[in-house]
Amino acid sequence: MRSNVDGYGFERGEDFDYKTYEEFMAKYISILARRASKWEVLVQNKTSIVKSRKVKRFCRKGIPNGHRAMVWMCVSGADEKMKRNPDTYKKLLLSQKDQSLMDTIDLDLHRTFPENIYFSTSDGLRKPLRNVLGAVAHKNHDQGYCQGLNFIVGLLLLLIKDEEKVFWLMDTLINDLLPDYYNPDMKAVKADQELLGEIIRWKDPEVYAHIEKHSVSWCLIGIKWFICLFADVLPVETVYRIWDCLFYEGAKILYRVSAMLVIQNRDKLLACKSFTEITDVFKEIVNNPTIVDCHTFLQKCFNELGSFPIARLKKLQEECRERP
Protein backbone atom coordinates (compact mmCIF):
# COMPACT_ATOMS: atom_id res chain seq x y z
CA MET A 1 0.00 0.00 0.00
CA ARG A 2 1.34 3.44 -0.97
CA SER A 3 2.03 5.78 1.93
CA ASN A 4 0.71 9.34 1.77
CA VAL A 5 3.67 10.49 3.92
CA ASP A 6 7.30 10.24 2.78
CA GLY A 7 10.28 9.13 4.85
CA TYR A 8 10.93 12.68 6.07
CA GLY A 9 7.35 13.26 7.24
CA PHE A 10 6.06 15.26 4.26
CA GLU A 11 2.48 14.55 3.23
CA ARG A 12 2.10 13.63 -0.41
CA GLY A 13 -0.54 15.63 -2.23
CA GLU A 14 -3.20 14.22 -4.53
CA ASP A 15 -1.03 15.15 -7.52
CA PHE A 16 2.05 13.29 -6.22
CA ASP A 17 3.62 11.31 -9.07
CA TYR A 18 4.06 7.87 -7.47
CA LYS A 19 5.07 6.27 -10.78
CA THR A 20 8.04 8.60 -11.37
CA TYR A 21 9.09 8.34 -7.73
CA GLU A 22 8.88 4.54 -7.64
CA GLU A 23 10.84 4.23 -10.89
CA PHE A 24 13.54 6.47 -9.43
CA MET A 25 13.68 4.61 -6.09
CA ALA A 26 13.97 1.24 -7.86
CA LYS A 27 17.30 2.47 -9.27
CA TYR A 28 18.39 4.71 -6.41
CA ILE A 29 18.17 2.07 -3.68
CA SER A 30 21.07 0.12 -5.20
CA ILE A 31 23.06 3.35 -5.59
CA LEU A 32 22.43 4.14 -1.91
CA ALA A 33 23.60 0.67 -0.88
CA ARG A 34 26.77 0.99 -2.96
CA ARG A 35 27.57 4.46 -1.62
CA ALA A 36 26.85 3.33 1.97
CA SER A 37 29.38 0.48 1.69
CA LYS A 38 32.04 2.87 0.34
CA TRP A 39 31.37 5.38 3.12
CA GLU A 40 31.59 2.61 5.74
CA VAL A 41 35.10 1.79 4.54
CA LEU A 42 36.07 5.48 4.52
CA VAL A 43 34.61 6.32 7.93
CA GLN A 44 35.37 3.05 9.79
CA ASN A 45 33.73 4.09 13.06
CA LYS A 46 35.57 7.44 13.13
CA THR A 47 33.92 10.36 14.90
CA SER A 48 35.46 12.91 12.52
CA ILE A 49 36.72 13.13 8.97
CA VAL A 50 39.32 15.32 7.25
CA LYS A 51 38.78 17.13 3.93
CA SER A 52 40.53 15.53 0.97
CA ARG A 53 40.02 15.06 -2.76
CA LYS A 54 38.54 11.63 -2.06
CA VAL A 55 36.10 13.00 0.54
CA LYS A 56 35.10 15.78 -1.87
CA ARG A 57 34.41 13.18 -4.58
CA PHE A 58 32.41 11.09 -2.12
CA CYS A 59 30.37 14.14 -1.05
CA ARG A 60 29.50 14.87 -4.67
CA LYS A 61 28.23 11.32 -5.09
CA GLY A 62 26.07 11.55 -1.96
CA ILE A 63 26.44 10.94 1.77
CA PRO A 64 24.27 8.29 3.46
CA ASN A 65 21.82 9.75 6.00
CA GLY A 66 23.57 7.92 8.83
CA HIS A 67 26.83 9.79 8.16
CA ARG A 68 25.50 13.17 7.00
CA ALA A 69 25.56 14.94 10.38
CA MET A 70 29.15 13.96 11.13
CA VAL A 71 30.45 14.64 7.62
CA TRP A 72 28.67 17.99 7.25
CA MET A 73 29.94 19.09 10.67
CA CYS A 74 33.54 18.11 9.87
CA VAL A 75 33.95 19.29 6.27
CA SER A 76 32.23 22.64 6.93
CA GLY A 77 34.28 23.47 10.02
CA ALA A 78 31.18 23.54 12.25
CA ASP A 79 32.51 20.69 14.40
CA GLU A 80 35.68 22.62 15.24
CA LYS A 81 33.63 25.71 16.13
CA MET A 82 31.39 23.71 18.44
CA LYS A 83 34.40 22.18 20.21
CA ARG A 84 36.00 25.61 20.69
CA ASN A 85 32.76 27.08 22.06
CA PRO A 86 31.17 24.31 24.14
CA ASP A 87 28.78 26.54 26.11
CA THR A 88 27.77 29.09 23.46
CA TYR A 89 24.49 27.49 22.38
CA LYS A 90 23.36 26.85 25.96
CA LYS A 91 24.14 30.46 26.94
CA LEU A 92 22.24 31.83 23.96
CA LEU A 93 19.17 29.79 24.91
CA LEU A 94 19.30 31.15 28.46
CA SER A 95 20.12 34.76 27.56
CA GLN A 96 17.71 37.70 27.51
CA LYS A 97 15.83 37.73 24.21
CA ASP A 98 15.01 40.61 21.87
CA GLN A 99 11.23 40.22 21.92
CA SER A 100 10.63 41.87 18.53
CA LEU A 101 13.11 39.44 16.98
CA MET A 102 11.39 36.45 18.58
CA ASP A 103 7.97 37.76 17.50
CA THR A 104 9.20 37.79 13.89
CA ILE A 105 10.52 34.24 14.24
CA ASP A 106 7.25 33.09 15.85
CA LEU A 107 5.33 34.29 12.79
CA ASP A 108 7.40 31.95 10.62
CA LEU A 109 7.06 28.86 12.81
CA HIS A 110 3.56 28.08 11.51
CA ARG A 111 4.67 28.75 7.93
CA THR A 112 7.51 26.24 8.11
CA PHE A 113 6.54 23.02 6.33
CA PRO A 114 2.90 22.88 7.54
CA GLU A 115 2.54 19.81 5.30
CA ASN A 116 5.12 17.96 7.41
CA ILE A 117 3.85 15.84 10.31
CA TYR A 118 6.80 16.89 12.50
CA PHE A 119 6.10 20.62 12.07
CA SER A 120 2.31 20.60 11.94
CA THR A 121 1.86 20.36 15.72
CA SER A 122 3.31 22.36 18.60
CA ASP A 123 4.81 19.26 20.27
CA GLY A 124 6.92 18.31 17.23
CA LEU A 125 9.94 20.19 15.90
CA ARG A 126 8.55 23.71 16.30
CA LYS A 127 10.24 24.28 19.68
CA PRO A 128 13.69 23.13 18.46
CA LEU A 129 13.13 25.27 15.34
CA ARG A 130 12.37 28.32 17.50
CA ASN A 131 15.38 27.62 19.72
CA VAL A 132 17.85 27.38 16.84
CA LEU A 133 16.47 30.35 14.89
CA GLY A 134 16.49 32.48 18.05
CA ALA A 135 20.07 31.49 18.91
CA VAL A 136 21.30 32.15 15.36
CA ALA A 137 19.59 35.56 15.24
CA HIS A 138 20.90 36.65 18.64
CA LYS A 139 24.47 35.51 17.97
CA ASN A 140 24.44 37.37 14.65
CA HIS A 141 22.52 40.36 15.95
CA ASP A 142 23.62 42.75 13.19
CA GLN A 143 22.03 40.41 10.66
CA GLY A 144 19.08 39.48 12.84
CA TYR A 145 16.57 37.07 11.36
CA CYS A 146 16.10 36.55 7.63
CA GLN A 147 13.01 34.84 6.24
CA GLY A 148 14.06 31.64 4.53
CA LEU A 149 16.37 30.52 7.33
CA ASN A 150 13.39 28.72 8.87
CA PHE A 151 13.25 26.29 5.92
CA ILE A 152 16.99 25.57 6.11
CA VAL A 153 16.88 24.95 9.87
CA GLY A 154 13.71 22.89 9.42
CA LEU A 155 15.34 20.50 6.95
CA LEU A 156 18.45 20.25 9.12
CA LEU A 157 16.34 19.33 12.15
CA LEU A 158 14.50 16.63 10.20
CA LEU A 159 17.84 14.94 9.57
CA ILE A 160 19.90 15.95 12.62
CA LYS A 161 17.96 15.78 15.86
CA ASP A 162 20.72 17.65 17.77
CA GLU A 163 19.85 21.37 18.13
CA GLU A 164 23.41 22.40 18.97
CA LYS A 165 24.84 20.78 15.85
CA VAL A 166 22.17 22.40 13.70
CA PHE A 167 22.99 25.76 15.32
CA TRP A 168 26.70 25.45 14.47
CA LEU A 169 25.97 24.33 10.92
CA MET A 170 23.81 27.44 10.51
CA ASP A 171 26.48 29.67 12.06
CA THR A 172 29.04 28.22 9.64
CA LEU A 173 26.74 28.74 6.65
CA ILE A 174 26.01 32.34 7.58
CA ASN A 175 29.50 33.45 8.55
CA ASP A 176 31.89 31.23 6.59
CA LEU A 177 30.35 29.49 3.59
CA LEU A 178 27.91 32.23 2.52
CA PRO A 179 29.18 35.43 4.18
CA ASP A 180 26.86 38.47 3.87
CA TYR A 181 24.08 36.44 2.20
CA TYR A 182 21.72 37.09 5.08
CA ASN A 183 22.57 40.73 5.80
CA PRO A 184 19.51 43.03 5.93
CA ASP A 185 20.48 44.70 2.61
CA MET A 186 20.81 41.25 0.94
CA LYS A 187 23.44 42.82 -1.31
CA ALA A 188 25.62 39.69 -1.56
CA VAL A 189 22.81 37.29 -2.41
CA LYS A 190 21.39 39.77 -4.95
CA ALA A 191 24.84 40.10 -6.53
CA ASP A 192 24.99 36.33 -6.83
CA GLN A 193 21.75 36.44 -8.86
CA GLU A 194 23.61 38.69 -11.29
CA LEU A 195 26.48 36.20 -11.16
CA LEU A 196 24.03 33.45 -12.14
CA GLY A 197 23.14 35.56 -15.18
CA GLU A 198 26.82 35.89 -16.09
CA ILE A 199 27.29 32.12 -15.73
CA ILE A 200 24.36 31.53 -18.11
CA ARG A 201 25.88 34.08 -20.54
CA TRP A 202 29.15 32.08 -20.35
CA LYS A 203 27.62 28.58 -20.55
CA ASP A 204 24.63 29.23 -22.86
CA PRO A 205 24.72 32.68 -24.54
CA GLU A 206 21.53 32.02 -26.53
CA VAL A 207 19.41 31.38 -23.42
CA TYR A 208 21.00 34.38 -21.68
CA ALA A 209 20.20 36.69 -24.61
CA HIS A 210 16.61 35.43 -24.80
CA ILE A 211 15.95 36.01 -21.09
CA GLU A 212 17.57 39.47 -21.25
CA LYS A 213 15.53 40.34 -24.35
CA HIS A 214 12.33 39.85 -22.35
CA SER A 215 13.67 41.86 -19.37
CA VAL A 216 13.37 39.02 -16.85
CA SER A 217 15.66 39.82 -13.92
CA TRP A 218 17.91 37.08 -12.56
CA CYS A 219 16.93 38.17 -9.07
CA LEU A 220 13.30 37.35 -9.86
CA ILE A 221 14.35 33.92 -11.10
CA GLY A 222 16.70 32.74 -8.39
CA ILE A 223 16.42 34.74 -5.16
CA LYS A 224 14.44 32.04 -3.31
CA TRP A 225 16.74 29.31 -4.63
CA PHE A 226 19.74 31.03 -3.05
CA ILE A 227 18.20 32.33 0.18
CA CYS A 228 16.56 28.98 1.04
CA LEU A 229 19.44 26.93 -0.44
CA PHE A 230 16.70 25.13 -2.41
CA ALA A 231 14.81 24.09 0.75
CA ASP A 232 11.06 24.46 0.09
CA VAL A 233 11.96 24.62 -3.62
CA LEU A 234 13.27 21.20 -4.74
CA PRO A 235 12.46 17.66 -3.50
CA VAL A 236 13.98 17.01 -0.06
CA GLU A 237 16.42 14.28 -1.09
CA THR A 238 17.66 16.49 -3.94
CA VAL A 239 18.20 19.33 -1.46
CA TYR A 240 20.20 17.08 0.88
CA ARG A 241 22.35 15.95 -2.05
CA ILE A 242 23.03 19.60 -2.91
CA TRP A 243 23.91 20.28 0.74
CA ASP A 244 26.36 17.34 0.70
CA CYS A 245 28.36 19.50 -1.72
CA LEU A 246 27.48 22.87 -0.15
CA PHE A 247 28.98 22.07 3.24
CA TYR A 248 32.21 21.00 1.53
CA GLU A 249 32.49 23.46 -1.37
CA GLY A 250 30.40 26.48 -0.43
CA ALA A 251 28.36 28.59 -2.85
CA LYS A 252 29.82 27.07 -6.01
CA ILE A 253 27.27 24.23 -5.95
CA LEU A 254 24.44 26.80 -5.82
CA TYR A 255 25.71 28.25 -9.11
CA ARG A 256 25.98 24.82 -10.72
CA VAL A 257 22.51 23.69 -9.68
CA SER A 258 20.88 27.00 -10.66
CA ALA A 259 22.61 27.00 -14.04
CA MET A 260 21.51 23.41 -14.68
CA LEU A 261 17.90 24.24 -13.76
CA VAL A 262 17.99 26.96 -16.42
CA ILE A 263 19.98 25.20 -19.14
CA GLN A 264 18.19 21.83 -19.01
CA ASN A 265 15.00 23.79 -19.78
CA ARG A 266 16.55 25.80 -22.62
CA ASP A 267 14.10 24.57 -25.29
CA LYS A 268 11.07 25.60 -23.23
CA LEU A 269 12.65 28.97 -22.43
CA LEU A 270 13.64 29.70 -26.04
CA ALA A 271 10.07 28.92 -27.13
CA CYS A 272 8.71 31.66 -24.83
CA LYS A 273 7.51 34.85 -26.47
CA SER A 274 6.93 37.06 -23.43
CA PHE A 275 8.03 37.96 -19.91
CA THR A 276 5.03 36.08 -18.47
CA GLU A 277 5.72 32.91 -20.45
CA ILE A 278 9.32 32.85 -19.21
CA THR A 279 8.35 33.36 -15.57
CA ASP A 280 5.72 30.62 -15.94
CA VAL A 281 8.42 28.22 -17.17
CA PHE A 282 10.54 29.06 -14.13
CA LYS A 283 7.60 28.30 -11.85
CA GLU A 284 7.35 24.85 -13.46
CA ILE A 285 11.10 24.15 -13.63
CA VAL A 286 11.24 23.06 -10.01
CA ASN A 287 8.49 20.48 -10.61
CA ASN A 288 10.33 18.78 -13.47
CA PRO A 289 10.39 14.97 -12.94
CA THR A 290 14.13 14.93 -13.75
CA ILE A 291 14.81 16.71 -10.46
CA VAL A 292 13.26 13.86 -8.45
CA ASP A 293 16.14 11.68 -9.70
CA CYS A 294 18.64 13.53 -7.52
CA HIS A 295 21.55 11.24 -8.46
CA THR A 296 21.26 11.79 -12.21
CA PHE A 297 20.51 15.49 -11.71
CA LEU A 298 23.68 16.03 -9.63
CA GLN A 299 25.73 14.04 -12.14
CA LYS A 300 24.47 16.37 -14.88
CA CYS A 301 25.35 19.42 -12.78
CA PHE A 302 28.98 18.27 -12.65
CA ASN A 303 29.39 16.53 -16.01
CA GLU A 304 27.41 18.65 -18.47
CA LEU A 305 28.28 22.19 -17.42
CA GLY A 306 32.05 21.92 -17.71
CA SER A 307 34.48 23.45 -15.24
CA PHE A 308 33.79 26.44 -12.99
CA PRO A 309 37.31 27.85 -12.41
CA ILE A 310 37.47 29.62 -9.05
CA ALA A 311 39.50 32.53 -10.46
CA ARG A 312 36.92 33.26 -13.16
CA LEU A 313 34.01 32.93 -10.73
CA LYS A 314 35.69 35.32 -8.28
CA LYS A 315 36.34 37.88 -11.02
CA LEU A 316 32.71 37.69 -12.20
CA GLN A 317 31.48 37.86 -8.60
CA GLU A 318 33.55 40.99 -7.90
CA GLU A 319 32.17 42.65 -11.04
CA CYS A 320 28.60 41.79 -10.01
CA ARG A 321 29.10 43.10 -6.47
CA GLU A 322 30.42 46.42 -7.81
CA ARG A 323 27.26 47.04 -9.83
CA PRO A 324 24.88 49.66 -8.39
Which residue stretches match the model-derived regions?
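Alpha-helical catalytic/interaction cores of small GTPase-regulatory modules
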Residues: 159-160, 166, 221-287
